[in-house]
């Protein structure tokens, strides 16, 4: 088990500079698998994985979702939890802090190579919900949405609900609102161009050895992401930088 860094209600693992807990009066905002692995080289199932310098395999690179989430960062605690990482010619910097209503995060990447590089950045938060079958996500209505399971694009009609595996990219910058009946979680991105919404459902979840039985019912991922035009990344010139942010607010339903 790694040593964690705590600042108020926030707990961070140095592996991935990974926010694993955000305790508030309504309960933890974040889901963490009961069988999550805290080992360098392994992704932590739950919390807020940091996705860089690419998302999934969209840029045809491995490992999926990049190396930021599986590498040990240098983490400094304080009123803000700050972390830094240098790897493969990139410098990454993350800041995490609590607010009265939840928490905020920023992640920046600078290109220290001599070449223009295509990169992608994202936060991949696992938000805790009571039951995914009773949960809705609003904010995408009327926007173009890419279904990553079928590679089809359509306009989102109505709120998002879940009845099976769900993996879609909302193209745009909406404020997304998760409602599980007992509380509301508002997710706002900064510097992003998409929101990814994901839940694996039972069949896909059974393939994960780091997710407890039926725990897929207790989270939804709503992910501010900078993916670039046609999901092919953004160009960062030598010495240049790019950043994204996320604001999370939680409130109890009346």
Regions found by a protein language model. Name each.
Residues 21-23, 115-122:
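Short, hydrophobic/aromatic beta-strand segments
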Residues 1-45, 174, 178-193, 201, ...:
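Beta-strand-rich N-terminal accessory domains
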Residues 117-118, 126-196:
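Active-site/ligand-binding surface loops and adjacent short beta/alpha elements
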Residues 12, 107-113:
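Asparagine-centered strand-capping/turn motif at beta-strand->loop junctions
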Residues 30-67, 191-211:
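Hot-dog-fold acyl-thioester-processing enzymes
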Residues 162-238:
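Acidic/His-leaning functional-site neighborhoods
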Residues 112-115, 252:
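Short, acidic/polar linear motifs in exposed loop/turn regions
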Residues 62-100:
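Extended, loop-rich substrate-binding clefts of extracytoplasmic carbohydrate-active enzymes
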């Amino acid at each position: 088990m790694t040593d964690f860094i705590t600042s108020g209600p926030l707990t961070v693992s140095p592996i991935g500079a990974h926010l694993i807990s955000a305790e508030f009066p309504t309960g933890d905002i974040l889901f963490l698998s009961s069988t999550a692995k805290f080992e360098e080289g392994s992704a932590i199932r739950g919390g807020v994985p940091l996705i860089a310098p690419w998302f999934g395999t969209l840029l045809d690179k491995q490992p999926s979702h990049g190396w930021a989430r599986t590498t040990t960062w240098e983490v400094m605690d304080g009123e803000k939890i700050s972390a830094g990482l240098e790897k493969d010619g990139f410098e990454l910097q993350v800041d995490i802090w609590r607010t009265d209503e939840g928490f905020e995060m920023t992640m920046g990447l600078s290109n220290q190579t001599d070449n223009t590089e295509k990169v992608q950045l994202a936060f991949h938060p696992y938000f805790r919900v009571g039951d995914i079958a009773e949960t809705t996500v609003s904010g995408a209505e009327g926007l173009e949405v890419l279904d990553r399971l079928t590679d089809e694009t359509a306009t989102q009609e109505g709120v998002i609900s879940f009845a099976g595996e769900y993996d879609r990219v909302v193209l745009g910058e909406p404020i997304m609102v998760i409602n599980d009946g007992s509380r509301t979680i508002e997710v706002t991105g900064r510097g992003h161009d998409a929101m990814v919404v994901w839940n694996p459902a039972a069949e896909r979840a059974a393939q994960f050895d780091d997710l407890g039985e039926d725990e897929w019912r207790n989270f939804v991922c709503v992910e501010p992401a900078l993916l670039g035009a046609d999901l092919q990344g953004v160009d960062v010139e030598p010495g240049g930088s790019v950043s994204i942010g996320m604001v999370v607010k939680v409130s109890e339903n009346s």
